[in-house]
């Protein structure tokens, strides 16, 4: 039986809730990890949504706060943390060998990218994250996206490549 050691958050923001805490209830020894810029999102939302004064904005709700370009070991796996701000200032992509998990930074090429109209989102940062931090990866790098909205009613897809993104991403 496999036991997860880490639960990775690519980002957090106000339009959806994370399932990480539910997973943590089932696997209490697993660490929840997120990029250390999460405090920027927490500060923004604390002000924007008038959260209680004592709401912590230091990322203390998470077990691990990752640094950009940090190499992390989890059991026999190793991954790289790549900050990819834009959708939120704290968006993070995780690279495992020849695969990346982008959250809302990139979607399938026929849908484009995540929104950047949330508080503290930035179209310029999102563009730079994709073109300078992800498009420098080999074209054959597998990309696992955070959502697939199935434009035109096509079948669900969740995997593409950096090469496909470069050639066909509509954004």
What residue spans do the PLM features occupy?
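Metallo-beta-lactamase
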Residues: 44, 51, 78-83, 88-171
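Active-site HxH/HxHxD metal-binding segment of metal-dependent hydrolases
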Residues: 2-77, 167
């Amino acid at each position: 039986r496999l036991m997860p050691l880490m639960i990775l958050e690519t980002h957090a923001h106000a339009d959806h809730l994370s399932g990480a805490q539910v997973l943590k209830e089932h696997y209490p020894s697993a660490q929840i990890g997120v990029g250390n810029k999460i405090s920027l999102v927490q500060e923004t939302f604390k002000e924007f949504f008038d959260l209680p004064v004592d709401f912590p904005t230091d990322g203390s709700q998470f077990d691990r706060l990752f640094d950009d370009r940090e190499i992390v070991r989890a059991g026999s796996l190793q991954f790289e943390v790549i900050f990819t701000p834009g959708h939120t200032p704290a968006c993070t992509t995780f690279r495992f060998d020849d695969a990346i998990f982008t959250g809302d930074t990139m979607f399938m090429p026929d849908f484009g990218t995540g929104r950047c109209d949330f508080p503290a989102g930035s179209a310029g940062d999102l563009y730079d994250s994709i073109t300078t931090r992800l498009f420098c990866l080999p074209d054959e790098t597998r990309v696992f996206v955070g959502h697939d909205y199935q434009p035109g009613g096509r079948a669900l897809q969740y995997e593409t490549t950096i090469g496909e993104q470069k050639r066909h991403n509509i954004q």
